[in-house]
Amino acid sequence: MNENLFTSFSAPTILGQPATIPIIMFPTLLIPTSKHLINNQLTTVQQNLIKLTLKQMMAPHNAKGQSWSLMLMSLITFITMTNLLGLLPHSFTPTTQLSMNLAMAIPLWAGTIITGLRFKTKNFLAHMLPQGTPTPLIPMLVMIETISLLIQPMALAVRLTANITAGHLLMHLIGNTMLTLSTINLSTTLLTSVLLMLLTILEIAVALIQAYVFTLLVNLYLHNNT
């Protein structure tokens, strides 16, 4: 059976209609919405992780930056759930789509830039020119700093897309190899299945780390502008 290696990254359809939006919104269904208090170990662990992450992210911020706490926690929760759901068999991972990652990165990056221009205009403009720069180099350095600023959202989106896509491609290749070897050599198939299991564990870690890195970089941009 010959299958395009990138078929699993194509946006799925249901009855001829794109199913991307329902899939993207699905992680929100996993968040409990009961008005009653739910006391169990899973909820306690979840709350402790949220408090720890929130404490680490909001520690260097002033009151203006801390107003973004709900946004950042929602972001890391959404990306984490989306990445993990994409590891399920025959599922679709929205974070492998550069368009979706850009749709998250550009508004968040623009929000931090607007915040900096509004509340700390002088400090924001001062970042465009390092102190002590020789006069002949000023135009070139301003241009370089401007370009580096403008490519920040692209770097955010490409980093997340590349890491998630690379892991899924490896799992796809090793899975196909295991199916092919199952009719040839049983011992080699077992070794390949162990390798696939280890790679799956690694991909779970990558899914968590990439969600944290994406949110942490947005948090860093916010810290530089508040």
UniProtKB/Swiss-Prot annotation:
Keywords: ATP synthesis, CF(0), Hydrogen ion transport, Ion transport, Membrane, Mitochondrion, Mitochondrion inner membrane, Transmembrane, Transmembrane helix, Transport
GO cellular component: mitochondrial inner membrane; proton-transporting ATP synthase complex
TM spans (from-to): 11-31, 68-88, 97-117, 138-158, 164-184, 194-214
Record flagged with keyword Transport: yes
Subcellular location: Mitochondrion inner membrane
Lipid bilayer topology: Multi-pass membrane protein
InterPro entries: ATP_synth_F0_asu, ATP_synth_F0_asu_AS, ATP_synth_F0_asu_bact/mt, F0_ATP_A_sf
GO biological process: proton motive force-driven ATP synthesis; proton transmembrane transport
CDD domains in the record: ATP-synt_Fo_a_6 (cd00310)
GO molecular function per UniProt: proton channel activity; proton-transporting ATP synthase activity, rotational mechanism
Catalytic activity: H(+)(in) = H(+)(out)
Entry's family note: Belongs to the ATPase A chain family.
Subunit annotation: Component of the ATP synthase complex composed at least of ATP5F1A/subunit alpha, ATP5F1B/subunit beta, ATP5MC1/subunit c (homooctomer), MT-ATP6/subunit a, MT-ATP8/subunit 8, ATP5ME/subunit e, ATP5MF/subunit f, ATP5MG/subunit g, ATP5MK/subunit k, ATP5MJ/subunit j, ATP5F1C/subunit gamma, ATP5F1D/subunit delta, ATP5F1E/subunit epsilon, ATP5PF/subunit F6, ATP5PB/subunit b, ATP5PD/subunit d, ATP5PO/subunit OSCP.
Function comment: Subunit a, of the mitochondrial membrane ATP synthase complex (F(1)F(0) ATP synthase or Complex V) that produces ATP from ADP in the presence of a proton gradient across the membrane which is generated by electron transport complexes of the respiratory chain. ATP synthase complex consist of a soluble F(1) head domain - the catalytic core - and a membrane F(1) domain - the membrane proton channel. These two domains are linked by a central stalk rotating inside the F(1) region and a stationary peripheral stalk.
Name by which UniProt lists this protein: ATP synthase F(0) complex subunit a
Encoding gene (name): MT-ATP6
